[in-house]
């Protein structure tokens, strides 16, 4: 059985209503006409909002299988504006792909190593342990020869530089000696010569 309300409660219920603020667009016809003529300032979103059912399905999948990791973007893709850097005068930064090493055409060792290592990665061959160890040994041998070749090249380069420096030093020494001789000759020529008399 419902409880009876007092008269004051009934009065309060009817009197204390919320004020409704109506926009003049609905009451004033002129304002409504002005609003109709306004261009649509905000363009419609091209992305369609998923329905409630689709959202529920997606959430159920997330609960079952876990959320997919979103794609990670690189800094270059995000188009972040580059802050002002200190520019070193006279130094030009290299452009182009970094870490790109070109192999010489006549560098057979590097080519051989690359071919063998690529085959090692991508050839799914059922081979015995002996064959596999032999193949790995070949790759190691090629790498070792390549390292030896690089060391030899370094040594040759260093020797060439030493020779060049020695040659420069010897040329400079020869020039200094030549200049000293010329200076001595000039000094002798500047002094007054004494007359010499020879008796027969």
From Swiss-Prot:
Residues 1-58, 143-200 are annotated as: Disordered. Residues 143-167, 180-193 have a biased composition (Basic and acidic residues). The gene is LOC1. Belongs to the LOC1 family. GO terms for molecular function: mRNA binding. This is 60S ribosomal subunit assembly/export protein LOC1. Required for efficient assembly and nuclear export of the 60S ribosomal subunit. Residues 121-191 form a coiled coil. It is found in: Nucleus, Nucleolus. Component of the 66S pre-ribosomal particle. One of its GO terms (biological process) is ribosomal large subunit biogenesis. Residues 43-58 have a biased composition (Basic residues). GO terms for cellular component: nucleolus; preribosome, large subunit precursor. Keywords: Coiled coil, mRNA transport, Nucleus, Ribosome biogenesis, Transport. It comes from Meyerozyma guilliermondii (strain ATCC 6260 / CBS 566 / DSM 6381 / JCM 1539 / NBRC 10279 / NRRL Y-324).
């Amino acid at each position: 059985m419902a409880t009876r309300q007092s008269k004051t409660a009934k009065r309060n219920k009817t009197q204390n209503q919320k004020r409704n603020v109506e926009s003049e667009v609905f009451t004033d016809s002129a304002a409504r006409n002005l609003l109709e003529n306004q261009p649509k300032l905000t363009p419609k979103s091209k992305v369609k909002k998923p329905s409630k059912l689709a959202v529920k399905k997606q959430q159920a999948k997330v609960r079952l299988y876990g959320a997919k990791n979103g794609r990670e973007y690189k800094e270059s893709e995000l188009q972040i504006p580059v802050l002002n850097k200190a520019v070193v005068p006279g130094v030009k930064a290299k452009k182009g792909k970094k870490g790109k090493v070109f192999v010489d055409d006549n560098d057979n060792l590097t080519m051989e190593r690359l071919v063998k290592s690529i085959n090692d990665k991508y050839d799914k061959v059922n081979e015995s342990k002996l064959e596999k160890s032999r193949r790995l040994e070949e790759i190691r041998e090629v790498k070792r020869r390549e390292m030896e070749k690089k060391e030899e090249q370094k040594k040759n380069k260093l020797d060439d530089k030493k020779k060049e420096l020695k040659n420069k030093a010897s040329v400079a020494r020869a020039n200094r000696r030549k200049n000293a001789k010329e200076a001595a000759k000039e000094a002798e020529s500047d002094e007054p010569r004494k007359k010499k008399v020879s008796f027969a």
